[in-house]
Amino acid sequence: MALTLAAAAELLDRHHLLREIIQGDCWTDDAADLAGADEPFTAITYDTRKVVPDTLLCCKGRFKAEYLTDIDTTGLAAYGAETEYSAVTRTPGLIVNDARKAMSLLSAEFYGRPQDELTVIGITGTKGKTTTAYFVQAVLNAYSGGRAALFSSVDNCLDGHTYAESDLTTPESMDAFRMMREAVDNGMRYLVMEVSSQAYKVERVYGLTFDAGAFLNISPDHISAIEHPTFEDYLYCKRQITHNCRTLVLGADCDHADLIRQDAQASNVPVTTFALHAADGHGTHADFVALPDASSGYLFQEQGKAIGDFSLELEGEFNAANAAAAIALSRAVGVPTGSEAFRALEHVHIPGRMEHYESGNMVAYVDYAHNYVSTKTLAEFVTHKYADRNPRVVVVTGSVGDKAVDRREGIIKGAQDYADRIILTAEDTVHERMIDILHEMQGYITNPRVVSDIELDRAKAIEKAVEDAHAHADRLTILLVIGKGEERWIKVDGKHAPYEGDDHVVKRLFGLLND
């Protein structure tokens, strides 16, 4: 059914969000008092530059009245906002208590509630969301014949096979429901999506219930004035997935697991657990377990019974744990234990994740690692993997400006016990000066054996790391180039500036580029 002003008002009122409807001097809570209340909206947007005739405009965030200058000439049908703008527009305004919640509900309704036509899986956690999401999509694609969509921090996929770079870990609600509708129209049956803490903080998934949710792990991240003021707030937002899913997959070793179980119990949500065990019977009890297997890589079990042994293309024990979570989620949405679809786990490749290159005495890993946990995990992995070759480790990294300020110290803490040298370089920033961020990071280095320097040009920083390896040709040097993955841009003063890409720089310097 098409969304009209009357239907929008009724929906918002049902969710206790509607304050009143205002058009000029008419203030009412009954849309029938206004002309055209039953005329359908033909478009919905939160960007005044995209208004066309019969559009419903959602005013969110730091919206300003000046954005509505001359808006009546565009054919705007109505707007939703926490403030009335009768002084600048003659169109009716749906005045609400929470504009972001309202936008999510109205967007879902405008696009015909596409979530009801999909089996939706939501994945949260500090580390592993992207990898787990790709694993689940691969299994569901194999199981359904390519009918699984994906929303991730790396790429979005709306047809099961075409991937486009994403802007946000979890899209704005309006964009999410628009993409869900496109996925449904493309014949998709499943949607796998990462769910960030910000998604709950700013109501991007308000009103959305996941058929299966996952809470992988938790550690401090995204703590800043514009994200989460405290770890408690970060964890609280993450925990909301527990109240908004039909079944929950939980990391058995997750910090605060008891609290998350209490949340699930309060919402009558069944919990399934997963874990990585060092050997059979050695680890926290879990329903789904990944075990090292000398012959194949990892043996995966469900309730103590083998699902199969798989050799994962993605290296590292942490990725085996992510695969166990993916198996648990796939089982939760109906993939049978013996399905050959699980073989798809072996061939998952994620752009910019654990990209591995070798040349002479050099090994390089390009990865999106960007906080304490991901940096430490990667550094620990390569140190152990190449321990018999006594490697030197050179880390090339920076940290984003204007947000997640805790990452600056976290990245250093995660790297310095493994690194011989840390080269600090450019990352994305809006207002903060990058040189100030890098000097701050340098100040967090407490390990006296770590050599550090600053090179603002990111490509030159990687070149310095390669030169360092050449200067120590008698030893293996491992280069960890982290933070940007395969992104072909760096945000400078809030604007995207072209960048060669970490992976491309490494391949160029290693002589691995194809002509």
Model-derived segments and their meaning:
Residues 1-105, 109, 315, 504-515:
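N-terminal leader/targeting and accessory segments in enzymes
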Residues 1-19, 51-58, 62-64, 331-337, ...:
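ATP-dependent carboxylate-amine ligase
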Residues 9, 105-248, 252, 256-270:
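Phosphate-binding loop of NTP-binding sites
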Residues 51-52, 70-73, 83-92, 157-161, ...:
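Short loop/helix-cap segments at secondary-structure boundaries that form the rim of catalytic
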Residues 54, 87-89, 212-364, 442-446:
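Acidic, Mg2+-coordinating active-site environments of NTP-dependent enzymes
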Residues 63, 79-87, 152-155, 253-255, ...:
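Short, polar loop motifs at secondary-structure junctions
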Residues 71-75, 206-209, 241-246, 264-267, ...:
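Short, conserved loop/helix-junction motifs that constitute active-site signature segments
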Residues 103-107, 136, 140, 183, ...:
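Buried hydrophobic packing segments
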